[in-house]
């Protein structure tokens, strides 16, 4: 499957050109934002770690080996990309133990920048946001058009699609999920099960969002919508009055789409009709999610781009800096601007 099939239409028109992303790890930098002051004592050792060309799970395994503990005692808030320079927190549970020597875990791909003790372990999803610095190199695009589109995005946000990375190479994760769903089976390995269930939910969400981008309703509240604030998982129904809430205009409040689970869509009106139609069209995936015990959740359809700035360090480089909530994809912003080409290739666009 290609990117258009996995995500959906762009909100602001065709790509304005093309560029390369991730020619080096430094071209894609991620800093986890965690608003948790450490207590200074406790059985959990928290580590601020810089990784280069190393994903989160590999880093956790390396820390566990160096500390001489089981992998399950190492915790992290979120998964970060391998092809990037990332800084994120880990915690290691060490009841009654001194701080271990972690030098064996460190090399050119992993450095511990600071550490401290805390009374609790680091919970999944505990980070407040992710800060990004992206460098798009070999840029071939009109800068005036790019600047205008970036200004529009800063004012209006972008569709909050799950990025193509969620679905694996050419949508391979979705193919695996469909195979298990058709057999009414679940993977035995917990990590595989989680990955494929997330893939299926993400695809159904993207189908709904794609339809609302196509009809122009993705950033507008309509009666029957369920509305949520940017940083909240709770939601409330939209009536006539809620559809004119001024917080919609300033990108604090947004319509939401389904993270599918048990039961029909809790939305109403045209929103429920669309969501249930998508679920009925993909009934095998929907029923698989329900049998797996997934609960219905919501995700905002519109993604505000926090603290968005940009400049051109060189004539063929665009540098973007911005902040996104957890679980949102930086590459979805890039997609609204340009097509990406693989490193060393300039004659055709890359599905990314």
UniProtKB/Swiss-Prot annotation:
Catalytic reaction annotation: uridine(13) in tRNA = pseudouridine(13) in tRNA
EC annotation from Swiss-Prot or TrEMBL: 5.4.99.27
The protein's name in its UniProt record: tRNA pseudouridine synthase D
Recorded name of the encoding gene: truD
Swiss-Prot/TrEMBL GO biological process terms: tRNA pseudouridine synthesis
GO molecular function: RNA binding; tRNA pseudouridine(13) synthase activity
GO CC terms of this entry: cytosol
Cited function: Responsible for synthesis of pseudouridine from uracil-13 in transfer RNAs.
Organism from which the protein derives: Pseudomonas syringae pv. syringae (strain B728a)
The protein's enzyme class: isomerase
Family of this protein: Belongs to the pseudouridine synthase TruD family.
Key word Amino-acid biosynthesis present: no
Residue ranges of every copy of the TRUD domain listed in the record: 157-303
Keywords: Isomerase, tRNA processing
Active site (UniProt): 81 (nucleophile)
Domain of life of the source: Bacteria
């Amino acid at each position: 499957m290609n990117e258009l099939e996995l995500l959906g239409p762009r909100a602001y028109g065709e790509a304005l050109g093309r560029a390369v992303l991730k020619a080096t790890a430094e071209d894609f930098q991620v800093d986890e934002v965690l608003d948790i002051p450490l207590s200074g004592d406790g059985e959990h050792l928290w580590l601020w770690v810089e990784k280069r060309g190393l994903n989160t799970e590999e880093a956790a395994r390396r820390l566990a080996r160096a500390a001489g503990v089981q992998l399950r005692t190492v915790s992290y808030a979120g998964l970060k990309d391998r092809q990037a320079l990332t800084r994120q927190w880990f915690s290691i549970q060490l009841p009654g133990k001194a701080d271990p020597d972690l030098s064996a875990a460190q090399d050119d791909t992993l450095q511990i920048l600071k550490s401290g003790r805390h009374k609790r372990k680091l919970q999944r999803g505990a980070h407040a946001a992710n800060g990004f610095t992206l460098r798009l190199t070999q840029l071939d695009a009109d800068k005036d058009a790019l600047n205008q589109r970036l200004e529009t995005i800063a004012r209006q946000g972008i569709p909050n699609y799950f990025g193509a990375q969620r679905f694996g190479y050419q949508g391979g994760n979705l193919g695996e999920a469909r195979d298990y769903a058709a057999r009414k089976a679940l993977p035995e390995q917990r990590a595989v099960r989680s990955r494929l269930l997330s893939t299926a939910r993400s695809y159904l969400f993207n189908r709904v969002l794609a339809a609302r981008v196509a009809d122009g309703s993705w950033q507008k509240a309509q009666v029957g919508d369920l509305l949520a604030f940017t940083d909240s998982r709770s939601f409330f129904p939209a009536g006539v009055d809620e559809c004119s809430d001024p917080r919609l205009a300033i990108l604090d409040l947004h319509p939401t789409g389904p993270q599918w689970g048990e039961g029909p869509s809790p939305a109403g009106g045209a929103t429920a009709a669309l969501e249930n139609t998508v679920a009925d069209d993909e009934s095998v995936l929907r029923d698989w999610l329900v049998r797996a015990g997934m609960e219905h959740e919501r995700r905002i359809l519109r993604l505000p781009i926090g603290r968005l700035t940009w400049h051109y360090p060189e004539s063929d480089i665009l540098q973007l800096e911005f902040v996104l909530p957890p679980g949102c994809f930086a590459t979805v912003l890039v997609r609204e601007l340009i097509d990406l080409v693989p490193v060393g290739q300039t004659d055709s666009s890359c599905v990314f």
